[in-house]
Amino acid sequence: MLQEESDLSLIIAQIVQKLKGSNLYSQLERQAWASLQRPEIKLESLKEDIKEFFKISGWEKKLQNAVYSELSVFPLPSHPAAPPEHLKEPLVYMRKAQGSWEKRILKSLNSMCTELSIPLARKRPVGEQKELLNKWNEMGTDEPDLSLFRPVYAPKDFLEVLINLRNPNYENGDSLSFRTHLGLIQVPLKVKDIPELKECFVELGLNIGQLGIDDSTQVPPELFENEHVRIGQKVLAEQDSAAAQQYIRQGSPTALRAELWALILNISSQPEDVLYYEQLKTNVIQHDLLVDSLIYKDVKLTASNDDYYFVFEDYLYQVLLCFSRDTSVLSHFAFNSASPPKSYIRGKLGLEEYAVFYPPNGVIPFHGFSMYVAPLCFLYHEPSKLYQIFREMYVRFFFRLHSISSHPSGIVSLCLLFETLLQTYLPQLFYHLREIGAQPLRISFKWMVRAFSGYLATDQLLLLWDRILGYNSLEILAVLAAAVFAFRAVNLMEVTSLAAAEAVLADLSTLKVMPLLQIFLFATVT
């Protein structure tokens, strides 16, 4: 009990400290001072009167949403004496593996720099700045020669690192478990089984109305949808983040989705947010970074060739180029197992006082990175709002998909959860695929690392991301990956090679997400 109270007071202190540096804090302060002029504020009951004023004027709700938003990304409380690196990742071998992986990425980036004889960063000449500013809204028409640039890494390279991950303190001895024999992921992490997942995703139950399911026997779909829209409008009118998060677990109506996601992520486009975005844009105009070419190359290789997303090419460049300059992203490294890469001012290699984070946001884009942004372009058409939503989605969720950690939503746990679900509930299929050299994870990894973006039809992907936001968890990605294998099990049992298995699972664009999840979670015999 005492420990819980101490944890709570520590969390409160840290959130208060974080909010003190925010724009909301100064707005609340200004409102409090302004309220002193009001006749209903009495000196003898000053504290209570100001609280009441905040409640009536809606500022209390804004403060609640800000606190709720901080709690959503806040790491679990650790021992007060624990060093800061424990907050990033408690397991030493995971931290070491992440550190080694980062060195490989940086080496790859630096060797590209040397091979192509180009600097990591340079100031653009005035003429080039003007040219970029003029074509800012039509960068997709640009055709720079990117043939010499290559992605720093692709998901399959990252998978090999995860496959070789081992806990040096863990000795299985002779009693090898079923999972250790069959799975590619060989680290002992606790993952949920289906009964625990049912409990976690209870709102996805067969007898609960869902958007994304057309054949409910209990209630006619249009009746449920009309009622769900009405409740959604009420949630938006209340401007309550927690209520919006609970509501969206049953899916979001298309017309309300953009506002609901913004409410859950606590994004409200203030003039200062637009100004901040414009400052980032100015940084892009003034300086050319090597990662800009990696971003161009990635968009050209992925989104530009996608039937759904090619129309958003200009938006993707704008958002990702600004993202690479955004130093506010660095704050998420406090609870991310990764650390931002460093570079040194020319001629000062190794001198820490001349070290700078590169790129400025600390995130080196990899092959497929632009697909985290692409689906959001369907919801937000104003660049600064689109940018804010993506940045918040990244620091809450997406960073976990390309860093090595023991977090339940981290990619290692998702891979292990996927393999465990298949091995436990579809053992014949799993064993068959393993025997023919088609380990299921080799096929599903690319889906999970991209959060299924670029694989599902957009309406289905947005329904899936509704649930990621609703449950504040990425575990549903592993469940869906297992559900896809279960759905195609009959065909997969007939294949005799990895290529044939990949062909069976090549096109997911016709799949309906919610029926697959429901059947796998609630109709599987456990």
From Swiss-Prot:
InterPro entries: Rab-GAP-TBC_dom, Rab-GAP_TBC_sf, TBC1D19. The keyword Mitochondrion does not apply. GO terms for molecular function: GTPase activator activity. Disulfide bonds: none annotated. Residues 251-472 form the Rab-GAP TBC domain. Gene3D superfamilies: Ypt/Rab-GAP domain of gyp1p, domain 3. Keywords: GTPase activation. The keyword Lipid metabolism does not apply. May act as a GTPase-activating protein for Rab family protein(s). This is TBC1 domain family member 19. It comes from Homo sapiens (Human).
